[in-house]
């Protein structure tokens, strides 16, 4: 799906949709970093501020969002169609044993963003090895993995409450430290 589905419109989707029960804004944007910062991270940070009056996560998260470009040096990003919420609970098999993916939150984005739910997906080394035989592994992939998990931790914080806040805050703090911000 990632290799064969490129977008001429840029990053986004022709309609907004949802990620779980949270609205997911998909306005077309020509730059991936701008799209991810504004429509994924900043949107979720605003929800956290509105729902929980959480100014700490909002301010620190905003600082990270303004500096995302530092994590994408020498990275070529082509928009490809993403499932958007890929984890073990959204994968099943039909009666013939063929895989079926459920409950998509589709948009065109950076292929690495697909792994944002890896913390509950059960993807092991064999999965990643097979994937990167087909798709080129970009420089800095390991350093960006948590960045894509952050979106989903923030979304879970907004949907399910404070149990997910510490994971999101830890990722933000780690990136602020890594980037000397």
Language model region names:
Residues 65, 69-73, 132:
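Generic structural signal for well-ordered alpha-helical scaffold segments
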Residues 24-37, 46, 75-81, 88-146, ...:
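Active-site Asp-x-Gly
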Residues 1-54, 78-79:
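A cross-family kinase active-site recognition segment
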Residues 44, 64-67, 153, 171:
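A ubiquitous structural signal for well-ordered alpha-helices
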Residues 55-68:
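Short, conserved active-site entrance elements at the starts or edges of catalytic domains
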Residues 51-56, 94-97:
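Short, glycine- and charge-enriched coil/turn segments that flank and shape catalytic ligand pockets
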């Amino acid at each position: 799906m990632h290799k064969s589905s490129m977008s001429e419109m840029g990053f986004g989707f022709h309609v907004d949709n949802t990620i779980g029960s949270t609205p997911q804004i998909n306005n077309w944007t020509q730059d991936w970093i701008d799209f991810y910062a504004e429509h994924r991270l900043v949107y979720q940070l605003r929800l956290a501020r509105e729902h929980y009056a959480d100014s700490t996560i909002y301010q620190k998260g905003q600082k990270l969002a303004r500096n995302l470009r530092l994590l994408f040096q020498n990275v070529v990003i082509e928009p490809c169609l993403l499932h958007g919420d890929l984890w073990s609970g959204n994968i099943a098999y039909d009666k013939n044993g063929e895989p079926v993916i459920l409950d998509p939150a589709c948009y065109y984005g950076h292929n690495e963003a697909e792994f944002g739910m890896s913390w509950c997906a059960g993807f092991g080394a064999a999965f990643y090895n097979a994937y990167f035989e087909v798709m080129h592994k970009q420089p800095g992939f390991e350093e960006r993995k948590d960045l894509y998990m952050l979106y989903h931790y923030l979304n879970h914080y907004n949907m399910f409450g404070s149990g997910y806040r510490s994971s999101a805050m830890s990722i933000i703090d780690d990136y602020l430290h890594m980037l000397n911000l």
